[in-house]
């Protein structure tokens, strides 16, 4: 019922769309109320999952439009200048994210936001224009939520790519494998990140496996930052640049701390592919 209400916001019929806005706004309000309840009332829950956050975006937009007496979030008006509605919506996402952070800090909960992906056009001065997979949200909302998240993963089916034939008859073929890979670091074709020293990709994604690996990764991160605190500002800046450049690879952490015993988090060992398409063992 909630999903249908959120989807109907795009209805072309004005009366139907306004009725759908009211229902979609109610979905947003219920979601915020439930997160507030988890924050304020005693309970034993350890994980909260929003599935999907791109569907919930319609509720956020409907909430803003009804509150501000606007027709559409993207329609230019005296209050909502061109594109301003989406900026106003980000303020509501900030309230949403503040509740998620409160669950993490006050209740020790993990909050998981699930989103469909979509192809995003990327203009980069260092390479040709290309597309990558990112969250199926408005650009401003996606950037905000990705910035605030501890980890952003892109999951997709593993596949083989090969060329069949020669010359003009050559054709690229793709065979999909049954297993799902979980990309944990930024790639040319997807948006992802983590600061938990996870290998990229995770060979099989499971939430239990991630939690175990994350706990080990946090221990590694604590050791790295304890070491960084002993460095002078110039050395620390250089070390942080090295970490960012390698996507927080565990091998770089071992090199910075000077401890070869630092290894990949338990349950998350995999073969990593660097930006130079070389394989390193973790």
Show which residues each predicted segment covers.
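P-loop NTPase motor core
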Residues: 52-143
């Amino acid at each position: 019922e909630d999903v249908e209400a959120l989807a109907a916001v795009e209805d072309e019929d004005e009366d139907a769309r306004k009725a759908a806005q009211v229902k979609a706004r109610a979905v947003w309000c219920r979601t915020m109320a439930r997160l507030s309840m988890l924050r304020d009332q005693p309970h034993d829950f350890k994980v909260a999952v929003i599935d999907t956050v791109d569907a919930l975006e319609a509720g956020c937009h409907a909430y803003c439009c009804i509150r501000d007496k606007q027709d559409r979030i993207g329609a230019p008006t005296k209050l909502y200048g061109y594109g301003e509605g989406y900026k106003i919506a980000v303020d509501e996402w900030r309230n949403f994210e503040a509740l998620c952070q409160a669950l993490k800090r006050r209740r020790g909960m993990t909050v998981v936001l699930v989103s469909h992906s979509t192809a995003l056009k990327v203009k980069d001065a260092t390479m040709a224009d290309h597309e990558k997979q990112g969250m199926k949200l408005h650009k401003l909302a996606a950037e905000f939520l990705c910035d605030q998240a501890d980890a952003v993963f892109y999951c997709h089916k593993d596949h083989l790519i090969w060329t069949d034939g020669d010359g003009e008859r050559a054709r690229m073929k793709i065979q999909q494998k049954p297993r799902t890979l979980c990309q944990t670091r930024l790639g040319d074709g997807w948006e992802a990140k983590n600061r938990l020293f996870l290998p990229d990709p995770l060979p099989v994604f499971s939430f239990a496996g991630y939690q175990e690996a994350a706990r080990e990764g946090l221990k590694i991160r604590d050791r790295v930052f304890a070491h960084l605190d002993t460095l002078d500002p110039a050395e620390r800046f250089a070390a942080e640049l090295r970490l960012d450049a390698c996507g927080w690879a565990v091998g770089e952490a071992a090199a910075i701390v000077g401890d070869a015993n630092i290894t990949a988090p338990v349950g998350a060992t995999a073969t990593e592919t660097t930006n130079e398409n070389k394989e390193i063992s973790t």
